[in-house]
């Protein structure tokens, strides 16, 4: 217990310096190269302390590692790393990060990076949030793309892993929107890590009917046109109904949509979504 307290107190009192600042001030030499992926520990950083004193180095969450090949993706660091490096010594670390240019190709093995820069605003916020609240790789990647490439928050799929719902709530609050009631699925593309080609939308809805009558449900698109009819008109009793929406949206344009629920041709409820 005594040793644990000493280590914690030392970490709390030690002042760490940004890896970028140390490199600019000629205190360290660094070389960055891809390990051949775009998620997790995917960039290797070789560091040499070229001073005569120990250095306390900080690789910050929110730092964007700049891929020197513009056709390949930059990497957004999502995990803080603080470490000491003695005088005239070398070390190697692996940066934990995710791609932040969804339309680019993934970095190839040994591709060179520069130390890049610290992001600001929403990208910095999501990096620091995921540093404190990590979830599964697919969810973290989707969350980064929401802010780096303006992807629909509904692209973040619910999973059984603890923390995903809290992440969706935090993102909705950050964007000042409601938590999407639906999820959007995208096609795979071997030429890029994210295709941006939506094909399916799923999610539960609930509606209430004050009395019996003839029920009909449609989806209207951005130009108010009918995009889909859920069922033929059916006679139903009054009450509360739950319905699992499952829409094929492959050819639908991006924009705002409404599910309209009618009873005896009278509009009873509208449910919004966007793709």
Give a label for each model feature.
Residues 40-42, 185-212, 242-244:
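Contiguous beta-strand segments within globular domains
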Residues 66-114, 225, 231-244:
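Intrinsically disordered, low-complexity Pro/Gly/Ser/Thr-rich segments with frequent PxxP/GP/PP motifs
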Residues 1-14:
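Bacterial Sec-dependent N-terminal signal peptides
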Residues 53-72, 216-223:
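Short acidic, flexible loop segments centered on an aromatic residue
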Residues 217, 253-266:
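Short, aromatic- and glycine-rich surface loops/edge beta-strands on solvent-exposed regions
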Residues 267-275:
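Edge beta-strands of extracellular beta-sandwich domains
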Residues 41-54, 59:
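Asparagine-centered strand-capping/turn motif at beta-strand->loop junctions
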Residues 236-259:
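Short, surface-exposed loop/turn motifs with a glycine/proline- and acidic-biased composition
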């Amino acid at each position: 217990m005594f040793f644990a307290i000493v280590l914690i107190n030392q970490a709390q009192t030690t002042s760490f310096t940004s890896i970028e600042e140390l490199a600019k001030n000629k205190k360290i030499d660094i070389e960055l190269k891809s390990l051949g992926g775009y998620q997790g520990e995917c960039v290797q950083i070789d560091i040499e302390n070229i001073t005569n004193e120990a250095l306390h180095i900080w690789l910050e969450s929110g730092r964007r590692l700049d891929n020197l090949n513009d056709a390949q993706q930059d990497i957004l660091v999502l995990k803080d790393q603080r470490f000491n490096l003695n005088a005239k010594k070398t070390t190697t670390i692996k940066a934990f990060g995710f791609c932040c240019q969804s339309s680019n190709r993934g970095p190839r093995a040994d591709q060179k990076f520069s130390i890049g820069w610290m992001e600001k605003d929403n990208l910095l916020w999501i990096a620091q949030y995921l540093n404190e609240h990590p979830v599964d790789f697919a969810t973290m990647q989707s969350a980064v793309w929401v802010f780096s490439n303006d992807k629909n928050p509904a692209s973040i799929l619910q999973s059984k892993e603890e923390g995903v719902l809290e992440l969706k709530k935090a993102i909705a609050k950050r964007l000042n929107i409601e938590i999407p009631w639906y999820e959007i699925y995208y096609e795979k593309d071997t030429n890029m890590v994210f295709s941006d080609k939506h094909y399916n939308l799923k999610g539960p809805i609930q509606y209430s009917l004050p009395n019996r009558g003839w029920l009909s449900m449609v989806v209207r698109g951005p130009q108010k046109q009918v995009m889909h009819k859920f069922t033929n008109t059916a006679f139903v009793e009054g009450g509360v109904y739950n319905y699992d929406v499952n829409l094929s949206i492959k050819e639908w344009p991006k924009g705002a949509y409404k599910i309209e629920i009618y009873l005896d041709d009278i509009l009873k409820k509208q449910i919004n979504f966007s793709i």
